Amino acid sequence: MDTPFIYDKHVTGRYFIGRRSECMILGNLLKAGEHVSIYEPPKTGKMSLVHQTLFNLRNDGHQFIVAFVDMLNVRTLSEFLIKFGTSVMKSVASTPEEYDAMVRDYLDGTHFVFDRVRFATYEELVSLNWNPDMNDVRKMLELPVRIAQVKGLPYFVVLKEFQNLMNADEYD
């Protein structure tokens, strides 16, 4: 039986109905630089809300950078840091040379490297050459802030499936 409901695509533009007040509130919070967490049951339109809000902000002339970090199957701190860094860097760079320069410039003094083989094989822009320490965590989480300062634009990071962090051994 066919179902009229589509669950695997985000709804935006003229197809987006309802939740207008939530879009306005989320947009105002983002413009004010606030951190926002949206936690609802699966398939309730969270990502459609986020996409529509970003769409509205762009239509209103706001410039910003956004990275979507898909945390599905993230089970360790290392996996999180690699996915986070890869998504953040992909939002502002597009060539191996740019990725390599970003790791050198922004993640200096850490255990992160740009490994061309891992990039070609797994599309990972950052790799760890040792177990991550607190300096690695700090520098990686500061990466969007540092990029925003250099670019002079707000930077939004959307963590999809962030509850998976609770499954990491290092969560406690």
Regions found by a protein language model. Give the residues of each.
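P-loop NTPase nucleotide-binding core
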Residues: 32-35, 40-44, 48-166, 171
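A short, basic N-terminal segment
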Residues: 1-36
